[in-house]
Amino acid sequence: MPWIQLRIDTDGPHADALSDQLMEEGSISITFEDGKDTPIYEPTLGETPLWNHTVIIALFEADHDLVPVVERLKLLPYLGENFSHKIEQVEDKDWEREWMDNFHPIKFGDRLWICPSWREIPDPTAVNVILDPGLAFGTGTHPTTALCLEWLDGLDYRNKDVIDFGCGSGILAVAALKLGAEKVTGVDIDYQAIEASKANAERNGVEDQLALYLPEDQPEGLIADILVANILAGPLRELAPLIAEKVKPGGQLALSGLLKEQADEVSAFYSQWFEMDAPAHKDDWSRLTGIRK
């Protein structure tokens, strides 16, 4: 079935209201895009992340008459008579297949591959984590996840256990187990993350070695030889004392989810507990590592 789409330029504060209006007009899907190539790095907790200049793309069936839709939108006070918009024909495609075609196995470090389940494993002798892209949690394509996976690939896991603090999809926890960790504990504030981590551990056959907790349920005195936290700079600062007490003396730490310009400040803050290394960078993002004093 062919489609048409209506692209509208708006500002962030009005994007949600406009999205609701377009759904009432019969749109079958709404997509938000950055209108000025301005990335969002750290939205306020509970806030819908939207750019100051947002492009809304509303998809309609091809026989939907968009002329009266546009006329009604002109009556909205935050759009007005001359709002910027474009109507486009959309090629009919197998969208699910196209989405799947965009994901390929990715290698991290010397040993580790992250492979979608529908792709052939490039190197059966390597350490392979099977993980399908999801809507909410990491799959290895984001620079911060990649930085953490590369670090994990280079560690010695003999007789060591790991904490994945903010486990999300469980990609880091599962990777550590496949790389040789004896036990991993994953902690996340989101119950959906716990469920996603559990499912990915089961898919990779390491569920018996992975313990998963919401913060309020984690065991007292939880401590490990290795801790990785791929969250954001704000929580990394706020939770620093808690994170530090979960790493054994001489244990290893990796922090990511922070921008290049945030790295030095966060590193200096953690230096009261850790001997910190120079930051590693990928694109605009950084990873910090250190050894517990």
Swiss-Prot record:
Subcellular location: Cytoplasm
InterPro entries documented for this protein: Ribosomal_L11_MeTrfase_PrmA, Ribosomal_PrmA_MeTrfase, SAM-dependent_MTases_sf
Positions annotated to bind S-adenosyl-L-methionine: 145, 166, 188, 230
Gene Ontology terms describing biological process: methylation
PANTHER family: ELECTRON TRANSFER FLAVOPROTEIN BETA SUBUNIT LYSINE METHYLTRANSFERASE (PTHR43648:SF1)
Function field: Methylates ribosomal protein L11.
Family: Belongs to the methyltransferase superfamily. PrmA family.
Name assigned to this protein: Ribosomal protein L11 methyltransferase
